Amino acid sequence: MYVGWLGGAGLSLGNLLQLESQAAESQARRLEAKAKSVIHIYLQGGFAHMDSFDPKPDAPSEYRGILDPIATTLPGVYFSSHMKQTAKVADKLTVVRSMTHTEVDHSRGEHSMFTGYRPSPALVYPSVGSVVAHELGPRDAMPSYVCVPNQGSQFLGSGYLSNACGPFALGSDPARSNFSVRDLNLPKGIDEKRFERRKDWKQMVDGHFASLERDDALATMDSFYQRAYDLLASPQAREAFSLKSESDATRELYGMKPWGPVLRPSAGARFLIARRLVEAGARFVTVTYGAWDTHAFHYRGIETQLPDLDRAFAGLIRDLDERGMLDSTLVLVSSEFGRTPKVNAGGGRDHWPRVFSIVMAGGGVKRGQIYGASDALAAEPADNPLGVEDYITTVYHLLGIDAAKSLMSPGDRPQPIVTNGKVVQGLLA
């Protein structure tokens, strides 16, 4: 009675698409949204701010490291020498050099940066992507919230919200030559006519049971399946998950390359599919890239990743801008924390949440500015420190979501989306 994978996996995609009904029931106090979609680039492990967006050339050698600063399109603003392409689009970005929190553990830092809350043993809070799915729901046949290539952290999930608000993870890396997304194609032996026939049979059986028992859960379940069918039946939605139609020029713009001998996948393929997903209607796409936890041999680790990230990120910004999408697409680049200002005895940098850098672009964010500052050693905030509550509240504001609104947590206890967060006007266009 079920279509291939849908029967084998229970609700599967239908469960994911439960968010449509939840969004319909939501009584959100909607603000005017500047951003229609978000592309969130998560640099997993702890990204070194002083070797990327906040170099300190006048610091002692054990602090400044080995990368020279290079000029950007913003007068007097410098990035590290591995950020050559991003330096050319600095006039389209806001670089925050004063991000700060207190969590030195990876998982605790992730929870803080993804939810706007410090971790609590009593409650796991929902990620921004899951709140967006809950509050705004899907567009057309696309899932609201997608993770590329996988859910890079448990705290990118739905927290205390329903699992239906969790991300749809691709389950495969678009940089691989054999890339395909599970669950998006009809199984072998089931053509379009057979697919529609099975759908009709299920609707007939559901109608029979609905006449015998009026149950809200049954009615809700029915809508989940309908959404799953809609995605399977939409060629446009399925096409968004493929890179086959992209030109060689676009691939070159993103710096796409085959899977190489070094175990570092191409950022370009991941960022390009993120653009395709928001273009097709996805509201929130999180792309996880890299392994930045460089406690030893720091510069060896970043030299295999940072140029790839640089090319792909600059390509994404250019592509969105040229397509007229940047003003309505909020792009975020963040990590769970930064890295220690001083290089350790093993040639590495350790965890450092006290100050680090993030990037925001498009979607109502001011173009061409540096917000905040770190001190001379990139060790502490020196100006306009930005905490997680205000950062996440500002992201919600740009999406038209009131972060002061309460959602219902377990035990029917109202819980603000963010507690005591303020919109940072200095970040807004």
Locations of regions flagged by a protein language model:
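Ligand-binding pockets and gating/stacking loops
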Residues: M1-A429
